[in-house]
Amino acid sequence: MNKTKVIFCLPGRTFSDNFLKSWTNLVTELPKHNIKWAMSQKYHVNRYFVCNACLGGNSIGGKNQKPFQGKVDYDYLMWIDSDQVFEPQQFFNLLNKAKETNTSILSGLYLMQGGEVFATVEDWDKEFFKKNGYFKFLTPEDVSSRKEIFKVSYTGFGWLLVKRGVFESLDYPWVQPTWFDEDGIREMTTTDCGFMHRAAEKGFDTYIDPTIIVGHEKSTILQV
């Protein structure tokens, strides 16, 4: 049986003890699941730059360059942020679901700081944005009864599996902003949103597995 080749993209430079435990437990289990793996870890203060750096981008390589300059063979990229806390089985479930459903972009869920909403927008509701200045993020209640994967407008890069061929379909820089430009409003999108909308234009939609919810470690200031 051929091994599945996964490159783990880990943007950041500060990794907590909880992340270290999660990561160590995961890499210990990978060989048992017939997975050949590698890691790409980069840091930059600019989120767009660090995502492209994790993919081996070259600032003078031109728009037609491919991830890792086409020199690295892989089947999937797994993006994990430095503040995620997870169990190995959550990754294996994500990978298996992507294979079973032939899904090119698949993510689990994680709460954003504040703990009330996930880093996921299902509907690109422009009218909601015009009134509020942000899009409506999913809540735990929104997904409490959902068991099957479903398509979303965009989700965070924090726990994201991407099949080979997606980034390869895009011009460099592979991760770049797009714009909301309508009715006098002009705003730049986030890294995840820009990438996923450009990928969708190439036929690669983004899906969520609502049964996979990982931890998101954030500091809290306690005060009276």
Segments and roles (model prediction):
Residues K63-V85:
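Short beta-strand-to-loop acidic/aromatic patch adjacent to the donor-nucleotide binding site
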Residues P31, K99, A200:
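Anion (oxyanion) recognition and catalysis
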Residues M1-V45:
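N-proximal low-complexity "stem/linker" segments adjacent to membrane-targeting elements
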Residues E87-T178:
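Conserved catalytic core of nucleotide-sugar-dependent glycosyltransferases
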Residues P11, D83, L95-K97:
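Polar low-complexity intrinsically disordered regions
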Residues H44-G70, M196-H197:
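Short, conserved alpha-helix that lines the donor NDP-sugar binding/gating region
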Residues Y74, N102-T103, F204:
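Short, high-confidence coil segments that cap the C-terminus of an alpha-helix
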